[in-house]
Amino acid sequence: PLEAARYIDEFHSPDIGWHFDVGNVLAFGWPEQWIHILGKRIQKLHIKEYSRKKAAKTGPGSGFDVEFLEGDNDWPAVLKAIDDIGYSGWGIAEQPGADSPAGLKNLSDRMDRIFAS
C-alpha cells in the first residue's frame, strides 16, 4: 500500500486516485490496512468478497467465487477503516448473482448485513 500511495502522489493531481477493490486486495493483503494508507486517495470503492481458504484449496481465482459474508473479509474492520478516512463515495457491488430478481435480492440483503455490521 505504501508504494500505491506514492505512485498516486507522484502525479501531483487531485484528479488521480485509487479505485479500491476490497476483494482483490484481500487476495494478497489486508484491505483495512490499505484503506488507512491510501486514505483520501481512494476515489471509488468496489465491495467484493474473497475466500483465502477456497483459493488455497482450489486455486487463486476460485477465491472470488463466494457470496458476500462467505469469504474472509473482516467487514467490520473494513467499514471502520472506510469511516476513519472519511470516505463518502459510492460502494459498487462487484459480485456475481445479480442476473435475476432473486439473485439481486440476495445480493442486496447480504450487502445490508455487511453495512449493518
Model features per residue range: what roles?
Residues 1-16, 23-117:
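Histidine-acidic metal/acid-base catalytic patches
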